[in-house]
Amino acid sequence: MFIKVLGSAAGGGFPQWNCNCANCQGLRDGTIQAAPRTQSSIIVSDNGKEWVLCNASPDISQQIAHTPELNKAGVLRGTHIGGIILTDSQIDHTTGLLSLREGCPHQVWCTPEVHEDLSTGFPVFTMLRHWNGGLVHHPIAPQQPFTVDACPDLQFTAVPIASNAPPYSPYRDRPLPGHNVALFIENRRNGQTLFYAPGLGEPDEALLPWLQKADCLLIDGTVWQDDELQAAGVGRNTGRDMGHLALGDEHGMMALLASLPAKRKILIHINNTNPILNEQSPQRQALTQQGIEVSWDGMAITLQDTAC
């Protein structure tokens, strides 16, 4: 299985365009050791030629321009994106669909709850009908495996997770199970497995078996501490309010990852306020000591022989 991180930051990217927090200002003036990041999105493949896009970031055009694997040579117009899967209806995971309109129709897999949000509150499915058929919806049901024709050896399973619906949704603060899913991806030919969850608010007993059997975890690293935005003076929401489990809390994401057997544990969807973006910070060193990696834009991951 081949995975490439197109974008590794949370909403707004890093540095965020209007932010002068310690991280954003430090990156701009060169006083911290850090790398710019675009908003969260990945591609996966069973052969390294045809790809499935998992979430469509607002930065998708820039990301595709820096990903030669997606450029389809020998045709006047084309792409190696063979399908799109959405894990939620958040702005930073769906706005990129608008930038892909010239390539419509696109085959899009998402839950009915996500499709409802994207047909009403943020109606990209409705808007894009005017571009060559727009987005063709393939409903996915929790824990019901499905495949995408472009990558037939990969089996995808949507696993409901505790998080939140987007601020524009009428289901904000009262999400249904289909509003947020992780993806458990298995290569049916050799058993390689990836668990992808860019937004995870609270792991529960039903989720643990999926986490425990994954060879590789690509998982929510949004904030270090739950009140991080408040402490930085840039917002009032906590990590939990936004549907994200803080890394550094006593029973947070880092503690959870330490208990899991995956050979690689990689963080994605990292907020611009998170101190782990500073590669010399104590928080980053704590992750390194636990064997936890921090993804970056363009990071390539290859899973071979049931191991990462």
Curated annotation (Swiss-Prot):
It holds the Pfam family Lactamase_B_2. Keywords: PQQ biosynthesis, Transport. GO terms for biological process: pyrroloquinoline quinone biosynthetic process. The keyword Transport applies. Pathway: Cofactor biosynthesis; pyrroloquinoline quinone biosynthesis. Belongs to the PqqB family. May be involved in the transport of PQQ or its precursor to the periplasm. HAMAP family: PQQ_syn_PqqB (MF_00653). This is Coenzyme PQQ synthesis protein B. It comes from Klebsiella pneumoniae subsp. pneumoniae (strain ATCC 700721 / MGH 78578). The gene is pqqB.
